[in-house]
């Protein structure tokens, strides 16, 4: 339905892009009130535990934590003649009794430790106040209706609302908060029919990627009988007559493999409204390439079904098509080789407009005749520019092109012949997230925010090129007291890398500022500025928030991405280490005051640099990280990450992966800084076994007395759709941990 910025995703609690398919806890035991004797026994156990915790609250204490004993085996794997032990293999089975026991004990240790640290409740209250602002996102027009997300402030999940005019009174179309009291059911996808009368929506439970789709009548607010199951990351694309839609799905997995089953053999189906899913028509499959994923797309007013085929390398894909109006039409290839990226923009007649990196690492726009797709017939509409093209749409006979300029947003309106263009003035240094538009629309919508810029929704008049605010969030803090600036630093090999720094104005450069350094660095995903309540809270605590746009992302096009993948992955770690060294050298902070954080692929980053430079950081927080680089491809969407990382099945890749794999490079006897690892029990994107094995190994290897803790969230997944209450609790725990580890003031 829309493009949503990282900040908006977090604020709305509905979206997450990290390590997704490329179309890219508080544990019950720690808060449960049991009855009678069971409650007394539980309370007694916790009191004894907390008494012990009090002995080692100081990160520099001479007392080492007494960690739970993890279930251990004698598993040894042979990789091309190299023996590699995997003693904690059993922790990959989240449902095993031994794993559940160890997870419970680890959570008791972690939550007991955190509960005794001073300041947690004050931090939680401040986070709650900061999170409590009205949020909007994803404005889109279909038929006579405008659809958009709305969150009144602290709702666990954002609500889908609909209105007939921008000034009219909206009504609730979908409220996922009514699905479960704990807020763990989330909207993970949506698609309005062409006439706007029907609305397909996907719901995932407990943070899982598995999604069920239903169809709602917009006028009545009632669901039709249709139910689509066993989709992961699939979009829904309506047929030209709105009589059904195309979608992709996997086979139903055995119940015991819901968390770990590899995402293989995705197929495209057509669902006719009113039919049971079992009657859906198979449209396309590739059994010869079981790891490929396929997304169907019917462009507005087009007779063609397009198939976006992802073969495993981010930023590269195939394209196929089928003529839906021709009898007995067969699928044919448009782009038969996945050497570059090709993203459909629109179809006019038989002309397909594409955004591509073919012949343009930073992106260009071309047009091709679907009936005659030979390269000789291609026409360049908009050539490559100095900025990176990261999105394109067509409406009102114009192209809206979204660019990145040094990792923040810019935009242009360009004529269809590419001869005239005008800049769209952005409100500042931040991220513009554009919603979808229809070909005849005279308007487009975009959200804009930055690290120190509150979110707003803008309406762009396509005839005048002027923008106006239609929804504005009012946050509970004066943002004028904070500032964001961009600096550039040299990495180990001399590469110039950008970094955003956000803090209170008038920062004193004395090396004593608590600093939280974040990066992602992979999968052709850019880190652009976005408003996040947790970042404002960190600044309120006197901290500096540093976001490094290291290689591996899309900030400077495909070359920037390729410089941080596969055999060049060490560049990512070098860039991050260089960012830390720059912050120290320029007196923003010092090692005892420097914390690092990353999630998903960024969690891998934190684990890797922690092994390579444990002396450089004062604290570390790897979240839902890919920690076992030798086995990641065996679980969930891991098969689709082979193009980015390589695979241990390949001898050359194995050497590269083993050299930096966080799990396999933990140094026994090293002194690691205070570390808080986080994962979730329902994460089926990066299965929790990655973090569980990593934590067990790191705890046993730690020579120093600094705590190595793991926090395992319950009824949560990789991050998409995580309830507001869980997000606030999680960040309160992280910040009180950092407050203690970095010896921050009250």
Enumerate the predicted regions with their spans.
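Bacterial Sec-dependent signal peptides at the C-terminal "C-region" and cleavage site
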Residues: 50-66
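Short, positively charged and aromatic/hydrophobic N-terminal segments
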Residues: 3, 32-35, 39
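Active-site-proximal cap/loop segments of hydrolase catalytic domains
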Residues: 534, 541, 547-746
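Sec-dependent signal peptide recognition
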Residues: 43-49
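Peripheral, non-catalytic segments that deliver or gate enzyme domains
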Residues: 69, 82-90, 94-513, 523-541, ...
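Hydrophobic beta-strand anchors of alpha/beta hydrolase catalytic cores
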Residues: 514-518, 545, 675
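The conserved beta1-alpha1 loop
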Residues: 519-521, 679
């Amino acid at each position: 339905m829309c493009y949503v910025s990282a900040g908006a995703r977090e604020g709305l609690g509905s979206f997450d892009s990290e390590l997704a398919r490329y179309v890219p806890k508080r544990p019950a035991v720690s808060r449960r009130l049991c009855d009678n004797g069971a409650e007394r026994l539980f309370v007694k156990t916790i009191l004894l535990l907390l008494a012990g915790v009090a002995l080692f609250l100081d990160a520099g204490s001479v007392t080492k934590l007494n960690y739970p004993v993890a279930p251990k085996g004698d598993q040894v794997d042979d990789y091309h003649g190299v023996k590699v032990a995997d003693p904690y293999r059993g922790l990959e089975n989240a449902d095993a009794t031994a794993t559940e026991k160890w997870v419970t004990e680890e959570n008791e240790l972690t939550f007991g430790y955190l509960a005794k640290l001073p300041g947690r409740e004050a931090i939680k209250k401040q986070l709650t106040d900061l999170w409590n602002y009205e949020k909007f996102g994803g404005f889109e027009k279909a038929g006579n209706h405008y659809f958009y997300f709305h969150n009144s402030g602290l709702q666990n999940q954002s609500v889908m609302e609909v209105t007939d005019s921008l000034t009219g009174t909206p009504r609730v179309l979908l409220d996922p908060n009514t699905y479960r009291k704990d807020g763990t059911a989330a909207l993970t996808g949506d698609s309005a029919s062409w006439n706007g009368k029907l609305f397909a929506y996907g719901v995932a439970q407990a943070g899982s990627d598995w999604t069920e789709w239903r169809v709602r009548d917009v006028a009545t607010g009632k669901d039709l009988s249709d139910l689509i199951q066993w989709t992961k990351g699939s979009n829904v694309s309506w047929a030209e007559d709105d009589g059904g839609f195309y979608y992709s799905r996997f086979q139903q997995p055995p119940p015991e493999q819901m968390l770990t089953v590899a995402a293989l053999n995705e197929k495209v189906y057509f669902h006719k409204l009113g039919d049971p899913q079992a009657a859906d028509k198979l449209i396309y499959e590739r059994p010869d390439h079981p790891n490929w994923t396929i997304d169907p797309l019917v462009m507005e007013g087009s007779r063609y079904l397009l198939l976006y085929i992802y073969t495993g390398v981010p930023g590269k894909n195939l394209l196929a098509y089928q003529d839906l109006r021709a009898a007995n039409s067969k699928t044919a290839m448009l782009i038969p080789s996945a050497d570059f990226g090709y993203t459909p923009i629109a179809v006019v007649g038989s002309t397909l407009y594409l955004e591509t990196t073919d012949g343009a690492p930073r992106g260009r726009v071309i047009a091709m005749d679907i009936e005659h797709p030979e390269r000789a017939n291609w026409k360049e509409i908009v050539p490559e520019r100095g900025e990176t093209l990261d999105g394109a749409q067509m409406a009102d006979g114009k192209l809206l092109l979204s660019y990145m300029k040094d990792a923040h947003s810019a935009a242009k309106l360009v004529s269809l012949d590419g001869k005239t263009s005008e800049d769209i003035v952005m409100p500042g240094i931040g991220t513009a997230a554009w919603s979808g538009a229809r070909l005849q629309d005279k308007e487009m919508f975009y959200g804009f925010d930055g690290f120190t810029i509150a979110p707003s929704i803008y309406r762009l008049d396509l005839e005048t090129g002027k923008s106006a605010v239609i929804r504005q969030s009012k946050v509970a803090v004066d943002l004028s007291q904070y500032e964001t600036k961009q600096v550039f630093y040299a990495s180990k090999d001399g590469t110039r890398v950008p970094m955003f720094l956000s803090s209170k104005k008038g920062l004193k450069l004395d090396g004593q500022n608590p600093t939280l350094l974040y990066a992602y660095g992979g999968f052709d995903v850019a880190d652009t500025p976005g408003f996040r309540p947790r970042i404002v809270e960190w600044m309120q605590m006197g901290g500096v928030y540093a976001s490094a746009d290291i290689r591996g992302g899309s900030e400077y096009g495909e070359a920037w991405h390729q410089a941080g993948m596969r055999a060049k992955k060490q560049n990512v770690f070098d860039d991050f280490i260089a960012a830390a060294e720059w912050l120290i050298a320029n007196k923003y902070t010092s090692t005892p005051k420097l914390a690092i954080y990353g999630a998903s692929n960024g969690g891998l980053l934190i684990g890797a640099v922690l092994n390579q430079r444990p002396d450089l950081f004062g604290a570390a927080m790897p979240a839902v990280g890919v920690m076992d680089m030798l086995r990641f491809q065996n679980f969930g969407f891991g098969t689709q990450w082979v193009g980015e990382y390589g695979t241990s099945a390949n001898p050359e890749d194995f050497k590269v992966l083993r050299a930096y794999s966080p799990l396999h490079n933990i140094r026994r006897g090293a002194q690691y800084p205070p570390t808080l690892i986080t994962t979730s029990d329902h994460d089926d994107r990066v299965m929790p076994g990655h973090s569980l094995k990593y934590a067990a190994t790191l705890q046993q290897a730690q020579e120093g007395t600094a705590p190595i803790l793991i926090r395992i969230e319950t009824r949560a997944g990789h991050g998409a759709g995580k309830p507001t209450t869980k997000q606030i609790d999680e960040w309160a725990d992280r910040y009180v941990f950092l407050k203690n580890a970095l010896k921050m003031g009250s």
